[in-house]
């Protein structure tokens, strides 16, 4: 999963995104079936929504009710639990900072952490905006509480996350999940089938 791998599938997501959670269940296996790896890139949709004038899908009248039904249906299709945490939506700032702290040490460990965070949010319905929950997950994976506390308050990691969001905006990422495959953008969990076909054909 080397960040420098030119043919890697890039996976942008917000930890607060239900569709990001669903995509996280499938994207690694999908990419691996085509000999590709995945670069996981957590971002924050809040600053992006300020740019686009959007808001969380579940907060949109009429559309939000359908989206909740669709998320539950998609979760049943791939056989994973889904529970909407409260409060929702939530800010995943701490969870994202810890991801990049881990990423710079061990990319595989960062991805393993991301999957646990998603499960805590959307299977256990826990509030991952709380530093205590983020710390607990990292502790469970073998990291010391003092390391986690330091990382959460590290100004360099704060800037790192801001920079990742700015890069995403520059690349015209506007939602979660969002993918780049050979430079081609794909938005949404419902584009995984298109990504699969794109990788089979080599594009079209």
Q: Predicted regions span which residues?
A:
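C-terminal cap of thioredoxin/glutaredoxin-like
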Residues: 4-10, 16-36, 112, 116-204
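Structural alpha/beta surface segment adjacent to cysteine/selenocysteine redox centers
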Residues: 15, 19-121
């Amino acid at each position: 999963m080397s960040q420098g791998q030119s043919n890697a599938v890039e996976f942008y997501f917000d930890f607060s995104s239900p569709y990001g959670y669903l995509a996280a269940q499938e994207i690694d296996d999908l990419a691996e079936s085509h000999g590709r790896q995945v670069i996981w890139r957590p971002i924050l949709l809040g600053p992006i929504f300020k740019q686009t004038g959007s808001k969380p899908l579940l907060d949109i009248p009429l559309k939000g009710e359908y989206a909740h039904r669709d998320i539950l249906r998609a979760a049943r299709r791939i056989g994973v639990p889904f529970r909407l945490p409260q409060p929702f939506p939530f800010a995943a700032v701490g969870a994202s900072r810890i991801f990049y702290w881990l990423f710079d040490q061990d990319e595989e460990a960062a991805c393993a952490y991301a999957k646990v965070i998603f499960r805590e949010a959307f299977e256990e319905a826990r509030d991952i905006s709380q530093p205590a929950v983020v710390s607990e997950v990292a502790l469970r994976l073998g990291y010391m509480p003092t390391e986690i506390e330091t990382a959460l308050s590290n100004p360099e990691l704060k800037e790192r996350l801001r920079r990742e969001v700015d890069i995403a905006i520059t690349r015209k990422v506007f939602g979660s999940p969002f993918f780049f495959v050979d430079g081609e953008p794909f938005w949404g969990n419902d584009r995984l089938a298109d990504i699969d076909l794109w990788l089979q054909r080599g594009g079209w």
